Amino acid sequence: MAKKHVSDLDLKGKVVLERADFNVPLKDGKITNDNRIVQALPTIEYILDQGGRLVLFSHLGKVKEESDKEKLTLRPVAERLSEKLGKDVNFIPHTRGEVLEKAIAELKDGEVLLVENTRFEDLDGKKESKNDPELGKYWASLGDVFVNDAFGTAHRSHASNVGIASNLESAAGDLMEKEIKFIGGVVNNPDKPVVAILGGAKVSDKIGVIENLLNVADKVLIGGGMAYTFLKAQGYEIGKSLLEADKVDFAKDLLERAGDKIVLPVDAKVAREFSNEAQFTVVTIDQIPADQEALDIGPKTVELFEKELKGAHTVVWNGPMGVFEFENFAQGTVGVCEAIAEMKDATTIIGGGDSAAAAMMLGFEDDFSHISTGGGASLEYLEGKELPGIQSISDK
């Protein structure tokens, strides 16, 4: 069922509650990457241009004890957002109560305020994270309509997304709608042929994704640390490479079911120690020395993956091909990233997390159709799960 979009709502003079995702990295109280704030701007600017009176909600980090409050306040976000918008953002250092209610009542058309970190409510019985019905109802009572633009928390059922949406007419923001279109599109109605590239360290993190994408994709290319559990299942000796011994039988079963759909590395960069400075060699998969571990896919694998990508209409990539934080072991990830970035006629999607970080680090963010803002949310969406944050948005 299609979900309402913010443009379907009448916003002029209305108090618009919006759940944004301002969960940005901080160091010594300073924001080190404001990408999430930048990506939230189109919806915020649209609401303000339409004459909405905007009340923004977001979480920041995990709030476990009273002392976390000082370092996890949203005040730095309010300051950065104000810079980006070129207008005042009234920061309210409360999540409920008279000060907040008065500030909302005094909002004029086109003005914006930011409520303090929603997870401050977790100090008293996890009210935000457990979607306390009274809290959801209270927050909903502060506004006329609700806009959810926080895909990063769409897989969570919290008071500030599902709780508010259950009590108010609600719609998706631009960012949320883009995620539904691209990530949801891969799962529900992709333009074929579809090639999925999966990497990262653990098979266990991606079991649901692999299972679901095998139903959708024409090919699933597997790299990263997780590939070695599959290679072990094929009978290869993998030396000291990453292995999830309890997942070998699962990998074996999957390989049998998938036939030639799954494509594994044919060579690897191996080293004796886990370090960027480690001496490395490139070996074929059947030649990994017993005392060494694979830290990246090799050049022949990059070539093979490039060949498998040719002709694909939809490509979804989730997870790096090696230890891309080490420059000497980043070539596999760089090679795959470049190959996908050059596919101008295909729909190319990065499913969040480390691959998104890699693409941005390499300067390729503008070369993909879509880079997801969700980590866990993208994975659960790719698994084919219903996400409560999306489900709770009003249908058209």
Swiss-Prot record:
Pathway(s) where this gene product acts: Carbohydrate degradation; glycolysis; pyruvate from D-glyceraldehyde 3-phosphate: step 2/5
Domain of life: Bacteria
Reactions performed catalytically: (2R)-3-phosphoglycerate + ATP = (2R)-3-phospho-glyceroyl phosphate + ADP
InterPro entries: Phosphoglycerate_kinase, Phosphoglycerate_kinase_N, Phosphoglycerate_kinase_sf
GO molecular function: ADP binding; ATP binding; phosphoglycerate kinase activity
UniProt keyword Cell wall biogenesis/degradation present: no
Group of enzyme by EC: transferase
EC annotation from Swiss-Prot or TrEMBL: 2.7.2.3
Record: residues binding ATP: K206, E325, G352, G353, D354, S355
Keyword Repeat part of the UniProt annotation: no
Keywords on record: ATP-binding, Cytoplasm, Glycolysis, Kinase, Nucleotide-binding, Transferase
Location in the cell: Cytoplasm
Gene Ontology CC: one annotated term: cytosol
GO BP annotations, alphabetical order: gluconeogenesis; glycolytic process
Classification via Pfam families: PGK (PF00162)
Protein residues bound to substrate: D21, F22, N23, R36, H59, L60, G61, K62, R119, R156
PANTHER family for this protein: PHOSPHOGLYCERATE KINASE, PHOSPHOGLYCERATE KINASE 1, CHLOROPLASTIC-RELATED
Family: Belongs to the phosphoglycerate kinase family.
Oligomer status and interactors: Monomer.
Name used for this protein in its record: Phosphoglycerate kinase
The organism of origin for this protein: Staphylococcus carnosus (strain TM300)
Gene expressing this chain: pgk
